[in-house]
């Protein structure tokens, strides 16, 4: 299969200066993630302004739960992205095409499964999370409608992951912008005009997700290279499924472990009542915009590292890691400082209540300022996954981020002197320090192994060059 002659959206990750291309990849991806967050932010703002604090708490309290239920399958999309990027870097077009068709069919199966689980289990899980009784019905309704559109969500995420494997982060941005505009308009119409409350914002989100999924599928169908989607070739290739799962399941488990810990944290937040819940929900929405920058540099690091790993350029991989981490930390801390400085104004967008704004500022001061630590933790994982280390970061995350949070909340937080909301929030920076330090130590040893592979690879090439003249003489 021939490569597409139309390479406007592709980025050459194998040659040239790294930083400009890294930014060209990461900036549209950051904007794309921010647009996705605007879907949720629009939900939160419209509900907070026109439906009340109970509805705001109902929508916000679902954030961690939605992440918990979807992260395993979004991890599989990371596996598809890494595998596709390796084949792209190695110019193995037939294998890339098989990866595309396996990934799309896998996304459909994943979406259907999540829809069933989300609709049937919504109320039970929310009760387990200690969702207050006066919020429970609204939260359950929102969650069930949201998960009705999960097939479209999975389809978009897998499709966008495949496009990113070639360096194309621009078209997913355009598609999210189009669907985001529709989402905001429908939010206003359903809630203000039809008085549909949380059902309206959930329905608007589902419709917008369907639009973005349709656009990304259309894009893949119109491709002329190995990324082209042909519905007649849709099938699960067992080897490709195994390879996707080898990368994606550890990534998904890591995401689920994070989310499980966050659900536990959310349960602790819920115990302080509706005002703290609403303030925390609004602050989480702001923090997610900061995290979008971290996620962009993580995904850039994964894509660049995977392509160069496929091409065998190990020296370039080390440069990519250093530039990704430094740039990710600097830009993240800049966003963090801005979020705290303008915190009262930003939180005021979500709720007119002074008590809710004050509660949100407590969270921002204890968590947002330390997101640079999270950047180190997450971005360096991209280097490990890009060179094939998938289990290691999962185990580090299990112990450093998840176990430490659960231990803190079940021990220190339970002491009367420390049983206050600040002691819930501090668990984030503490776990980031522990996990980031461990990831850096792991990367040190992995990079030494990569150096040995480089020397062995160069020695093998030199030996082949020495043998070539002898073969010619014979």
Question: In which residue ranges do the predicted regions lie?
Answer:
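Short alpha-helical transmembrane segments in multi-pass integral membrane proteins
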Residues: 1-26, 84-149, 182, 193-249, ...
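Small-residue hotspots at the loop-to-helix junctions and early N-terminal turns
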Residues: 51-64, 139, 143, 202, ...
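Transmembrane helical elements of multi-pass membrane transporters/channels
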Residues: 24-43, 145, 156, 179, ...
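Short runs within selected transmembrane alpha-helices of multi-pass transporters and secretion channels
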Residues: 77, 145-164, 175-183, 201-216, ...
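Transmembrane alpha-helix boundary and packing residues in multipass membrane permease domains
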Residues: 29, 33, 45, 82, ...
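Small-residue-rich hydrophobic transmembrane alpha-helices
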Residues: 56-116, 153-172, 279-343, 374-397, ...
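N-terminal transmembrane alpha-helices
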Residues: 13-50, 64-79, 83, 108-115, ...
């Amino acid at each position: 299969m021939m490569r597409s002659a139309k390479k406007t959206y592709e980025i050459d990750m194998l040659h040239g200066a790294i930083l400009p291309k890294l930014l060209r990849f990461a900036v549209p991806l950051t904007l794309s993630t921010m647009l996705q967050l605007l879907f949720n932010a629009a939900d939160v703002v419209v509900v907070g302004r026109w439906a009340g604090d109970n509805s705001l708490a109902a929508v916000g309290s679902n954030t961690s739960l939605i992440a918990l239920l979807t992260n395993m399958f979004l991890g599989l999309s990371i596996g598809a992205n890494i595998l596709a990027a390796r084949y792209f870097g190695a110019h193995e077009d037939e294998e890339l095409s098989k990866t595309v068709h396996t990934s799309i069919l896998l996304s459909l199966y994943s979406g259907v499964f999540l829809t069933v689980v989300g609709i049937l289990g919504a109320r039970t899980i929310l009760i387990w999370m200690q969702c207050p009784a006066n919020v429970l019905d609204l939260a359950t309704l929102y969650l069930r409608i949201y998960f009705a559109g999960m097939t479209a969500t999975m389809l978009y995420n897998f499709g966008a992951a495949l496009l990113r494997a070639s360096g194309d982060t621009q078209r997913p941005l355009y598609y999210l912008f189009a669907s985001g505009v529709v989402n905001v308009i429908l939010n206003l119409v359903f809630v203000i005009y039809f008085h549909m409350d949380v059902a309206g914002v959930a329905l608007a989100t589902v419709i917008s997700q369907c639009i973005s999924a349709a656009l990304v599928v259309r894009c893949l169908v119109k491709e002329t290279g190995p990324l082209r989607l042909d519905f007649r070739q849709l099938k699960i290739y067992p080897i490709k499924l195994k390879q996707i799962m080898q990368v994606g399941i550890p990534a998904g488990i890591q995401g689920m472990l994070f989310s499980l810990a966050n659900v536990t944290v959310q349960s602790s937040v819920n115990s302080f009542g509706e005002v703290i819940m609403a303030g925390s929900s609004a602050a989480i929405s702001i923090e997610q915009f900061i995290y979008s920058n971290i996620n962009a540099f993580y995904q850039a690091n994964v894509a660049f590292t995977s392509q160069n790993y496929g091409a065998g350029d190990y020296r370039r991989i080390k440069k990519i890691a250093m530039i990704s981490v430094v740039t990710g930390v600097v830009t993240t801390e800049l966003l963090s400082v801005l979020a705290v400085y303008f915190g009262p104004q930003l939180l005021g967008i979500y709720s007119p209540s002074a008590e809710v704004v004050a509660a949100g500022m407590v969270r921002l001061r204890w968590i947002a300022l330390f997101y640079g630590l999270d950047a180190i933790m997450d971005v360096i994982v991209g280097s490990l996954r890009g060179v094939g280390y998938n289990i290691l970061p999962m185990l580090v995350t299990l112990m450093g981020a998840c176990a430490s949070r659960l231990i803190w909340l079940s021990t220190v937080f339970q002491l009367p002197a420390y049983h206050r909301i600040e002691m819930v929030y501090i668990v984030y920076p503490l776990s980031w320090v522990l996990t980031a330090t461990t990831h850096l130590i792991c990367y040190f040893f992995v990079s030494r192994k990569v150096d040995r592979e480089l020397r062995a690879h160069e020695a093998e090439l030199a030996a082949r060059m020495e043998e070539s003249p002898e073969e010619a003489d014979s």
